[in-house]
Amino acid sequence: SNLLNEEELAVIDKQKRTFTEPQLFTIGYEGRSLEKYINILLINDVHILCDVRKNAYSQKYGFSKGQLEKACTGVGIKYIHIPQLGIESEQRQDLKSQKDYEILFESYEKSTLKENWDYLLYVRELIDTEKRVALTCFEESRKQCHRGRVAKYLMQLPDITYTLKHL
């Protein structure tokens, strides 16, 4: 019933290192299979996956909330959905150029992020307690995804002990 069989898990175990330093990651699943995506999380010793999609539904196999949560749980990663940090899908229509994304994300920073500051602090708390936390959304490029903006704000908070890595 698990996504990966014993043999595959053993291979990942060999590559997997245990890290003690706190780290914030961002990861998109566009262009990745569920297996490859989970492998990346495991190799980087991610403890918590924070899904920052407004609607955790995907037509891509394995990435709807229930499926993704099950896949994570199966390999010992805790899955948390934080829709409050997401962007309404109607605001995501008609994004043709990088400029369109910039305009959308600037408005996202001024509205959604400001209004949901507590959820940003909640993610900070998760990093402080669980050490290895990844923010996830669809887009492959963080420049075309709001998870990059969430990460930017998390990196600007005072007294942080963690570093940022884009997977």
Model-identified regions with their sequence ranges:
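Residues lining hydrophobic/aromatic ligand-binding pockets adjacent to catalytic sites
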Residues: S1-L167
